[in-house]
Structures are given as C-alpha cells and as structure tokens.
C-alpha cells in the first residue's frame, strides 16, 4: 500500500498516478473484470485519489491524504489540489488497515461543492455507491446509476468494500500554498482552471488522457461490432454463405477478408491456406463471450488472428478450433 501520511503535491501526484495504474491495469491479481472501466474515468467530472489509514477499537477513525482534480469545460483536467480525508465510524473493528482509494465525482455539482467550500462531506447531499468494475462498455447502460460519487477501494492489493458515509474531503490549503507559491490560493482557483497544470504531474495527466482515448476506441469498437452483427444477420437472411474458388490455389476455397472495423486502420492476416506464416496470439485471460459472433477462449489458447487493428484496446477477429469471431485484444499477447 502507499503512504497515507500527507506530503507535498509533487509526491501526491506521483502517488496518484501509481494508484490509478494499479486500479486500471490487468494483472495476476486484477483480471479483466476487476479493473475500473475506462468510460467511468473518461466521463467523470472530477476524481480524488488518496491513501487512507483506518484504526479501530469500538470506534473507527479514518484519515489520509491525496489529490483532487476537476474536468474543465474543454475536456482537459485541472491542476491538482491537495486534500485530506477524515471521518469516524461505529462498529467493533479492532486493528489498523491501510487502503488506496479512488473517488469518482460523476456530477459537476459535487466538484463545485468541494471547490467553493473547500470541503465535501460524502453521503451528505451526495449519494455514494461502489463503482462498477470490468471493461464491458455495452453493459454500461445496465450499471448506470444516479450516484453522484463512485468509490473504489483496495486493501492488500485486492478490491474491498468501504463505507465513506460521513467522511469528509478537506482542502489542504498550506500544501497548495507551498506548491503553487501563492499565499491566498484556494481550491476553486485550482479546480476551475485558473492555475496552469504543473509539469510535476505529467505522468498523472498522461494516464488520465489515456482513459479518454481507450473509451473512444471502445465506443467505436462497440458500434462496429453492432454493425458487423447486423451485416451478418442480413447476409444470412438474404443468401447462403459461399466462397468463390481461387484459380491460383488448386481449387481450394479462399476466405474473403472481413474488416470488423472498417473505419479503423487495420492489418488483415490471410488464412493459413493462402500463406505459410500467420499471426498467432496467446490468451492471457479467459473470455467467455457475451454475444453471438464473439470468440470465447481459455487462458493459454492459441488464436489465429484474422483481422487486427493497431491498438490492443480494440476488438480483433480470430479463429480457434474451427470457430471464427471477435475478441478483446488486450486479453491476449501476440507471439
């Protein structure tokens, strides 16, 4: 876990970048269904990233430090503002626990409430809910809620539930003053774009911007998947599937190239029958498939890639055990 003791904004920004990576990268502990989806961060109006320590004996006390950022009108992220978190809770918990916490502010009013007042009480005027996990953008409609705030908590490297009702995000004015060199600087100036983004937070901004890129790619991929399914349905209903014979291939049938995403730059890989070499991908994680036309597989399966784009945050077309379908490219590694 990361250090919950308050530090300067440069260190807090580095810590926030590290935490976001841990919450959004597929690893041995985080399967594809155990990461914050790109669209959650891409659509957020603000977010806070903190490390929190909780100590309990009959009454639990919580404290920690981190930063908060807001989405500016042009879509860019604001400069970071240093914050702390504090709260008390009931229960018969005994012991000390350190956790990492990501708080997604879904509504602009939540950002404004914090920026103008300097503090924000969670669970007061704003509903708080555990945020959705997984990368299935098509399930976005099912998981949408009216919650103003999503929370994600990791303890000992694993996602865990946390109750933040009554906890408050507190502006660390002195830390902001020292970092930005202005005696009277306030959170609303930082979060409303009146302060330039510091170069010390470059790594954090690169990570945040990548979520918007991933979301746009996934959104386009979902639309292309829907179009591809409709085209397959129309083709099946209008005529039987047949392939013309290739004159230079001794009468063998040649599979036509099918671009799953015609608007994306792609590289088509011929079938093994028409060329001696091919691209083979090894499945890193199991994929059960969610729609007809998906290609399910297990970890370790060898998939022949038929159509691919230049991004691994996309859907590719492949062949496995005689079945052809599309699959998420970041579930595999290309041999």
UniProtKB/Swiss-Prot annotation:
List the InterPro entries hit by this protein, alphabetically: SH3-like_dom_sf, SH3_domain, SH3_domain_YSC84-like, SH3YL1_SH3, SYLF_SH3YL1-like, Ysc84_actin-binding
In what residue span(s) does the SH3 domain sit?
276-335
Please name the GO terms that the record assigns under molecular function.
Answer: phosphatidylinositol binding
UniProt keyword annotation of Lipid metabolism present: no
Enumerate composition-biased segments (Basic and acidic residues). 227-237
Q: Name one Pfam family in it.
A: SH3_1
Its Gene Ontology cellular component terms are: ruffle membrane
Quote the SUPFAM superfamilies the UniProt record gives: SH3-domain
What superkingdom heads the lineage? Eukaryota
Per the record, the GO terms for biological process are: regulation of ruffle assembly
Entries under CDD domains matching the protein: SH3_SH3YL1_like, SYLF_SH3YL1_like
User: Where in this protein does the record put region Disordered?
Assistant: 225-274
Q: What keywords tag this UniProt record?
A: SH3 domain
Fetch the PANTHER family from UniProt: SH3 DOMAIN-CONTAINING YSC84-LIKE PROTEIN 1 (PTHR15629:SF2), SH3YL1 PROTEIN (PTHR15629)
**Similarity comment text for this entry:** Belongs to the SH3YL1 family.
The name of this protein is SH3 domain-containing YSC84-like protein 1
């Amino acid at each position: 876990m990361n250090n919950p003791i308050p530090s300067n904004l440069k260190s807090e920004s580095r810590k926030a970048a590290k935490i976001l990576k841990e919450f959004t990268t597929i690893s041995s502990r985080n399967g594809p269904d155990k990461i914050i989806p790109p669209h959650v961060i891409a659509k957020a109006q603000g977010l806070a990233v903190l490390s929190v320590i909780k100590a309990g004996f009959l009454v639990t006390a919580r404290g920690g430090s981190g930063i908060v950022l807001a989405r500016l009108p042009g879509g860019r992220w604001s400069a970071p503002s240093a914050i702390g978190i504090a709260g008390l809770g009931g229960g018969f918990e005994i012991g000390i626990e350190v956790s990492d916490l990501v708080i997604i502010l879904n509504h602009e009013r939540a950002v404004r409430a914090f920026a103008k007042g300097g503090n924000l009480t969670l669970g007061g005027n704003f509903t708080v809910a555990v945020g959705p996990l997984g990368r299935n953008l098509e399930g976005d409609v099912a998981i949408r809620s009216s919650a103003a705030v999503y929370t994600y908590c990791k303890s000992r490297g694993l996602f865990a539930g946390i109750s933040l009702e009554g906890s408050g995000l507190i502006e660390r004015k002195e830390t902001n003053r020292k970092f930005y060199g202005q005696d009277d600087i306030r959170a609303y100036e930082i979060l409303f774009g009146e302060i330039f983004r510091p170069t010390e937070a470059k790594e954090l901004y690169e990570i945040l911007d990548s979520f918007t890129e991933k979301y746009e790619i996934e959104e386009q991929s979902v639309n292309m998947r829907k179009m591809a399914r409709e085209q397959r349905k129309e083709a099946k209903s209008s005529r039987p599937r047949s392939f013309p014979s290739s004159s230079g291939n001794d009468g063998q049938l040649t599979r036509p190239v099918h671009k799953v995403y015609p608007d994306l730059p792609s590289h088509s890989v011929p079938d093994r029958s028409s060329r001696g070499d091919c691209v083979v991908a090894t499945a890193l994680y199991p994929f059960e498939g969610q729609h007809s036309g998906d290609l399910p597989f297990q970890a370790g399966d060898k998939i022949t890639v038929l159509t691919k784009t230049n991004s691994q945050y996309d859907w590719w077309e492949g062949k496995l055990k005689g079945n052809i379908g599309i699959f998420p490219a970041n579930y595999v590694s290309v041999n």
